[in-house]
Structures are given as structure tokens and as C-alpha cells.
Amino acid sequence: MSKKIETSAITAGRPAVTPDAPLNPSIDLTSTFHSGGPIGYGRYGNQTWTSLEDAISELEGGQTLTFSSGMAAISAVFSILPIGAPIVASNQGYSGVMSLLNSFHTSGRLEVRFVDVVNTQEVIDAMKGAALVWLESPTNPCLDVADLPALISAAKKLGIGVAVDNTFATPLVQNPLAMGADIVMHSVTKFLSGHSDVLMGSLSISDPALFKRLHDSRSFNGSIPGPFEAWLALRGLRTFPLRFNKSQESAKEL
């Protein structure tokens, strides 16, 4: 029997069940590890991050990497694209992303084709020759909703990668990886962590080779989360379904 997402939020990312084992993961405040293991150094991994990453993976699917912020996660995706690569992106969305994409477009780092994500055909028409389709749905703050299944399907037929910012919808509402997306991004700062005391981002990735490239990007750029922040985010994740459902009820009432 598959677990409900509410159950996964409570149970995922916990230590193995053995006699007298702690229920919660430890906060591993270390920069250095003994040799011979898979981590090697504090910029490459940390057991506290791993617990949070395992939990997000159980909600979103794929393999997950956590980052020092949502913008760090987004920047990692763009960092693996060639200079001048064409991408398709919404003409309105999170202000940090819009500023970054406009900067990339002006400098020639990327060729950004800005589109209205509500206009499905406009987005599809802009895809030809693109290296990536970056989708935010619902958008922040205007709440524009893209037809993700149609857009992801169209991109896949053209062999184009798709990344979806799932921060506002969350895995309680939609699972873009299950629709065929390659990457799902979260500003963990917002709904997943939910207590306004953590800056963090995450990427959930469907392909192991792509996961490795993004893992290397994080390691080399140093855009890693702190172990205490990862522990706080995991604690916040335990109540995520309750908080999200209550916020929807409040929004309907208002």
C-alpha cells in the first residue's frame, strides 16, 4: 500500500529503526569526515542534508539536492547550460528569477525567450531549438497557471529539458516529475519549511546523470545548506500538509 503524502511528510527522512535509535536525525556540525566513505568533505555532503533530501524525494519523487536558498538552486540549473543557450521562461514570475533571467539575457549568458505561460500555444511555438523550458506554475505573485501536462509533453517530443518551480503548488497539488519534467525546484523557505526561520532551496531530479551534474555544480560552487538549517527545514516539513491545507481553507474564506 502506498503512503499518503501526509504520512510521508511525518515519517520520511528518519533514521533506521533499531533499538534505542533516535526518532529524529542528528545535526551533524562537521566540516571533515574520516576517509573511506562516500562524503569525504563537508562541501560534498552531510547526513543531516541527506535526511531532508530523502524526505523531499519521497514527496516529489526522483533524487533531491538541497541548497543554501531557492535562488542558489535555480542558479545551479542555469549554470550547467552552455553560454548563449536558448531557454523558454515566463514573462512574469518570482522577482529574483526575473531579475536573474533579464541579466542573463542582456549579457548574452543565455538567450531567454519570455512567454505568457497561460498561452499554451505561445509557449510551444517558442520551444524550437531551446535547451530548457523553465516553468513556474502557479506563478509568484500573479498565480498564472500553465498547462503543465501539455507543455511538458510538447517539450519532451522536441527533446528539450523541463524544469518546474513547484513552490506555490507543492507536491500536495501536483507532481511535475510524474508528468515527465526533468527537474522540480522548491523554495524550501516557503511552504515546505514554513516557519520563516530558514533560507533553503531544493532540486528533485528524475535522471541520475543530470543529478550528478547538478550535484557537482553545488559542490564546486559551494551553494550548500547548513546542517542546522537542514534540520529546521525537516522539522518544518513534518507539519507541511496541515499548514498548507489550512492556508487553502483560509484563502477560500477570504
Which role fits each region the language model picked out?
Residues 1-28:
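Short conserved active-site loop signatures built around small residues
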Residues 10, 41, 192:
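Short clusters of hydrophobic/aromatic residues that line enzyme substrate/ligand-binding pockets
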Residues 17, 34-37, 210-211:
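Short, acidic Gly/Pro/Ser/Thr-rich loop/turn segments
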Residues 5-9, 55-58, 180-182, 186:
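Short, hydrophobic/aliphatic alpha-helical segments
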Residues 15, 64-254:
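Conserved PLP-enzyme active-site core in the AAT-like
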Residues 12, 31, 117:
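Active-site donor-binding loop signature of nucleotide-sugar glycosyltransferases
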Residues 25-80, 96-105:
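Conserved N-terminal alpha-helix of the aminotransferase class I/II PLP-enzyme fold
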